[in-house]
């Protein structure tokens, strides 16, 4: 009989042969199944997680007419057909309405309902994610991830086959390690079926961010931790595990697994390298976590009680039945690396040149002589022409800068107030001085795309990609198509968010 180390080595070899034979033969859920811990939920908007899977990955909904379509892999086991989305959503806004479960259990993720906390949408539901907020490529093929802004969340409170009570499970997610905050809580995993906080140990989910209300790791974060309810844990201590490092890989693999009085945190660069173990040992030294009382719902982007103040980006993830071996997880990581996640352009339409001075003209039929300008800190539209006073020309001129939060997009500095930039604040656009904070940089970063009405450019917020520069009663907002605010009204939306960009007046 083989010893335990020998069995482990044999399993690694077997999985290695699967991985090396072909990418399609080594999809993550095939690997977990070979390891004896099959997927009970498999979610991805970027690719199939089974080699034979050819069903829908996700559904998108158009803002113009409410029509929906499903996006499937290009071929069985392959990358999502982003071109089908681009065609369906051309010159329109689109939201991700369903993230389908590929496991066959029907554990699909949909718009999260209200719970202990209400969401910002109608009837307390959370927002849905933009379909274009997180473009990437996998082996050179374009796909879209799920960009979670604060207030956005997905959930399934009636999941099938997920771990209940103290039963063992594993999970991983591929995330954007540069997109996070300190809000509660950017999670993926097992949560309460009531959307309420029902006590310690009633969750087991991957958390990623810089929240320090409960636990923390080394450095200043962000960290991979486990949300076990009423605590984000980095190890056995409720307070800190110095072995849990700050990690900010552009593509990050985060893994959590837990069983009776044991659990582990693992992480890696999803683009290269191997998983490292940040914690492996007993359950936290606090009441309610041994045994666990997991309930089996599935969440994405939110906490178990619908806490929805966090942000992050999700590309793929699964949940398993049983406690996966390190060898199984290592083989999954090898497959993730082989998928070759890479960044791609966040912008489209007429090109902008960093350092240039521009003016932006409205295209709505009422307002084609009006340009984006400011009066003090208020961003508005004003009638401007070559005959206008120099002061007004300067107020309607903006210097293009590299995006303060993401170099793939842009920030717009006031010509007449150097050091001040357009930002969104409570979804109004305002002119504020750059205070150098992470929050300011994110609020002041915008990504142009081809104009939704066929003219010029539409300029969406990087941090809230459902929201665009919109003039409404001559005042500027970061508006979504048909959202809950007055300035989100669907009427004339595509016209109101389309701007013709020209050389600056000043």
Swiss-Prot record:
Q: Which reaction does it catalyse?
A: Hydrolysis of terminal non-reducing alpha-L-arabinofuranoside residues in alpha-L-arabinosides
Pathway entry: Glycan metabolism; L-arabinan degradation
| Region Catalytic, residue ranges | 27-343
Q: Which residues form a coiled coil?
A: none
What Gene3D superfamilies does this protein map onto?
A: 2.60.120.200, 2.80.10.50
**Which is a Gene Ontology cellular component entry for this protein?**
extracellular region
Catalytic residues as annotated in Swiss-Prot or TrEMBL: 229 (nucleophile), 305 (proton donor)
Q: Would you indicate the residue range of the signal peptide? A: 1-26
Q: Does the keyword Phosphoprotein apply?
A: no
Checking CDD domains in the record gives:
beta-trefoil_ABD_ABFB
InterPro entries assigned to the protein according to its UniProt record, in alphabetical order:
A-L-arabinofuranosidase_B_cat, ABFB, AbfB_ABD, AbfB_ABD_sf, ConA-like_dom_sf
Q: Where is this region: ABD?
A: 344-506
The record's Pfam families line, in alphabetical order, gives: AbfB, ArabFuran-catal
List site positions: Cis-peptide bond: 184-185
- SUPFAM superfamilies from the xrefs? AbfB domain (SSF110221), Concanavalin A-like lectins/glucanases (SSF49899)
First-listed, main subcellular location of the protein, grouped into a coarse class: secreted
Q: What is its EC number?
A: 3.2.1.55
Q: What subcellular compartments does it reside in?
A: Secreted
Residues reported to bind substrate: 227, 230, 304, 424, 426-427, 443, 471, 476, 496
Q: Sugar-bearing residues?
A: 285
The protein's UniProt keywords, in alphabetical order, are: Carbohydrate metabolism, Disulfide bond, Glycoprotein, Glycosidase, Hydrolase, Polysaccharide degradation, Secreted, Signal, Xylan degradation
- Description of its domains: Organized into two domains: an N-terminal catalytic domain and a C-terminal arabinose-binding domain (ABD).
Would you tell me the protein name for this molecule?
Answer: Probable alpha-L-arabinofuranosidase B
Source organism per UniProt: Aspergillus clavatus (strain ATCC 1007 / CBS 513.65 / DSM 816 / NCTC 3887 / NRRL 1 / QM 1276 / 107)
From the UniProt record, report the name of the gene that encodes this protein: abfB
